[in-house]
Amino acid sequence: EGYIRNNTSIHTYLDIMTDDVEEKANTWPVMQSDIRGDGYGYFCWQPNPEYRFTGALNADNAWETYYSKILIANNVIDLLDDAEGTQSDKDDLLGEAYFLRAYCYFMLVNLYGEPYEKESADKALGIPFNYEHSVRERTYKRETLARSYELIENDLKKSIHLLETTDYTKTVFRISKGAAYLLASRFYLYKKDYEQAISYADKVLTINSALYDIRTLTEEDYVFTKENPEIIWTYGDYEVNYLSAAYRGCFPVSMAFYNSFHANDARKRTYVKDDWGDLIVGKGAANTGVYG
């Protein structure tokens, strides 16, 4: 239950907020309506982006989803000692729980907190933290950005220590030592601690340095599948496909962005698909179950 399911829409509108897409009147024949108004607030960077043209609210599932997974991680962390099993198995599960909590808070602080700057982090706003394993009515205050990153780092270090100790061999569908190193490299990159980011990235490469030769793929093939040796951890496919599936006629891939790649760049025919004359993201098929 602590893992994010692949039918959960969390980051639906993030791509709309980048320069990677453009907007236009819907020309996709399968979807008759023009739904640009649904993503207007995000595309135009409005103060309250969840509001549509009509005044209706878009569902923001990230807040609810991540905090619900944090609650499950809290239960595992606080109550695992009462469970049956070997100490090694418990330690490994505990390492996964600390990873998931760190991951969820890291995603939340980047969605709802301010960008990390060391000089202002002790005053900038971060996010609320909950370490209780039961639900009760109370108000949680937002921690500073510095404190938010400190708490995430604490969980991340505990996760790495436990997963290094157990060092279980796992599939990409379970959190592993390599996945923890990867999250640490991303965490320190965002914190602008580049030496630590490089150090953990090097640790990832000692475990898996395989590259996927996308030049061998056809236009019908997808990049993120079980055959891709670069994937270290995966938990579903929904976020990869939702924008392309639901908004392809209104928010296609930006032609300026697409044309910035060399004509012979294999990414132009593997990461992007031509669908009814519109360029859409084509990283994975809806039934691949891969989102790494």
Pin down the residues of each PLM region.
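Hydrophobic-face positions in mid-chain alpha helices that act as interaction patches
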Residues: 4-13, 17-18, 174, 198-292
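Extended ligand-binding groove/face enriched in aromatic
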Residues: 95-99, 103-135
